[in-house]
């Protein structure tokens, strides 16, 4: 299968090329040139698969056995999920009043990003060992991506990872999960800015195509196609767990509620919908509501500033995966997508063309949820079920409660739960509840930390480039010594 840039200028690449890229050289994001179509028979066959089984089928569909033979692919995916705490890897909790919560947080760092990052890192290691190459991974994080990326890469002999975290804008636990990893190939920077601000030096570095090529740079943020590919399995598993039957014509709809920051899970869900999965998508955001405004009014524009909320991993103003959604909505029209995104980058504001907005609002519903509603939802879920939600999961569950309180017709619904409440004791306390903290999270408090500060006024881009150049020098020296 071939992958093309949403902006249509960069040459097409195979899965390996997309895997090792951040942004495409023309500033776009890689997408499959053609989407396969799944028929009813395939969906029925897949309906009995485990979550890892679905990941295997989806990856085989989008990678191609000539690049990665099926048995080797299956081994890599088994290895990726070997350290998850739940035997199902992903678990559905069926609670009162039709509330279905899909727990995506049974990995090492208690967040959904463990799922896609553990697989992506296995794919990277496979190709790096085959090609005898080294890469430097650069990640900007609002909280969970950084720790999951570090966990999946730490100690890998062919990879270094640089993580930029927003100092004071993620929770103490999230920060400790990153700064307590002291492996030689892990390099953490604490940035005096928010997650959108720290994305700027990263985007600038990736825009220098010669620099990226020279130093084998890549990203593990959800701009990486492999992340989106694995996340498609969330939607298939949600559907098969919640659909009442596969015997009806047409197949029944299931509503999937997606707590959304950078929109990787939304892009994955929309692709799943496009290839034949009968789901209705609901985007649930906090007060950083750019996607909600885009769905409701076609207004894809920045607010004055990022608002700090209890659902801190979603405190994002620039949901870069919307570019993938726009490209799909436009019928893979790279000219339309490029014009939209270049205008947004220039002016921070775009009004979607009428036809595009109409297609978006047909495909996706949206809701924006305040901190007060988050804590009320956490409290209600505990009162009704003795079940603790993280604040991000509560954003999704709030939509479910709105629907049942209005006595809306009951389509089966699944709320994606991206993180464990254990990672957000501050939010649990704000909801008037008692945090439950696992021993391995408590232990973080007593570990040594390592983090380099990027202060306001420092040249963040230069600091990042210098670090990358140092790592390249060290790798070249190591490779030379090994060959001698």
Swiss-Prot record:
A Pfam entry, by short name: Thr_synth_N
A cellular component term, taken from the record's GO annotations: extracellular space
GO function term, MF aspect, one: pyridoxal phosphate binding
Cofactors required: pyridoxal 5'-phosphate
Alphabetical list of CDD domains matching this protein: Thr-synth_2
Top EC category: lyase
InterPro entries attached to this UniProt entry: Thr_synth_N (IPR029144), Thr_synth_N_sf (IPR037158), Thr_synthase-like (IPR004450), Threonine_Synthase (IPR051166), TrpB-like_PALP (IPR001926), TrpB-like_PALP_sf (IPR036052)
UniProt entry keywords in alphabetical sequence: Cytokine, Lyase, Pyridoxal phosphate, Secreted
Modified residues (N6-(pyridoxal phosphate)lysine): 113
GO BP of this protein: 2-oxobutyrate biosynthetic process; serine family amino acid catabolic process
Family label: Belongs to the threonine synthase family.
EC identifiers of the protein: 4.2.3.-
Protein name: Threonine synthase-like 2
PANTHER family listed in its UniProt record: THREONINE SYNTHASE FAMILY MEMBER, THREONINE SYNTHASE-LIKE 2
Native source species: Homo sapiens
């Amino acid at each position: 299968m071939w992958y093309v840039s949403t902006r249509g200028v960069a040459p097409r690449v195979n899965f390996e090329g997309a895997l090792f890229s951040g942004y495409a050289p023309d500033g776009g994001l890689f997408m499959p040139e053609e989407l396969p179509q799944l028929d009813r028979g395939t969906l029925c066959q897949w309906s009995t698969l485990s979550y890892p089984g679905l990941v295997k089928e989806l990856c085989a569909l989008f990678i191609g056995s000539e690049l990665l033979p099926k048995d080797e692919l299956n081994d890599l995916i088994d290895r990726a999920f070997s350290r998850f705490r739940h035997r199902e890897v992903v678990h559905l909790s069926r609670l009162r009043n039709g509330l279905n919560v899909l727990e995506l947080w049974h990995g090492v760092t208690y967040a959904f990003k463990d799922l896609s990052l553990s697989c992506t890192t296995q794919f990277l290691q496979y190709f790096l060992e085959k090609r005898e190459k080294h890469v430097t991974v650069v990640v900007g994080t609002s909280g969970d991506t950084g720790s999951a990326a570090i966990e999946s890469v730490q100690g890998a002999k062919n990879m270094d990872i640089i993580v930029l975290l927003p100092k004071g804008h993620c929770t103490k636990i999230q920060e400790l999960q990153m700064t307590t990893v002291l492996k030689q190939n892990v390099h953490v920077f604490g940035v005096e800015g928010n997650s959108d601000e720290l994305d700027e030096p990263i985007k600038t570095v990736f825009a220098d195509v010669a620099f990226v090529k020279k130093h084998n740079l890549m990203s593990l943020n959800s701009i990486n196609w492999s992340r989106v590919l694995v996340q498609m399995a969330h939607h298939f598993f949600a559907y098969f767990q919640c659909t009442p039957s596969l015997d009806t014509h047409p197949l029944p709809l299931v509503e999937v509620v997606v707590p959304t920051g950078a929109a990787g899970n939304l892009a994955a869900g929309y692709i799943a919908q496009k290839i034949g999965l009968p789901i209705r998508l609901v985007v649930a955001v906090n007060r950083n509501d750019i996607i909600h405004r885009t769905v409701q009014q076609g207004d894809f524009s920045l607010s004055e500033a990022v608002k700090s909320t209890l659902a801190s991993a979603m405190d994002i103003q620039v949901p870069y995966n919307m570019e993938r959604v726009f490209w799909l909505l436009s019928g893979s029209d790279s000219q339309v997508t490029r014009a939209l995104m270049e205008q947004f980058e220039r002016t921070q504001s775009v009004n979607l063309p009428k036809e595009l907005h109409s297609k978006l609002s047909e495909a996706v519903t949206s809701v924006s949820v305040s901190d007060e509603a988050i804590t009320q939802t956490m409290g209600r879920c505990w009162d009704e079920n003795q079940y603790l939600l993280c604040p991000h999961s509560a954003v999704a569950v709030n939509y479910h409660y709105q629907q049942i309180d209005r006595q809306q017709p009951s389509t089966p619904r699944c709320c994606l739960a991206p993180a464990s409440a254990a990672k957000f004791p501050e939010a649990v306390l704000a909801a008037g509840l008692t945090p439950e903290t696992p021993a391995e999270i408590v232990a973080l408090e007593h570990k040594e930390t390592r983090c380099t500060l990027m202060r306001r006024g420092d040249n963040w881009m230069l600091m990042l480039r210098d670090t990358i150049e140092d790592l390249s020098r060290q790798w070249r020296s190591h490779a030379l010594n090994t060959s001698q």
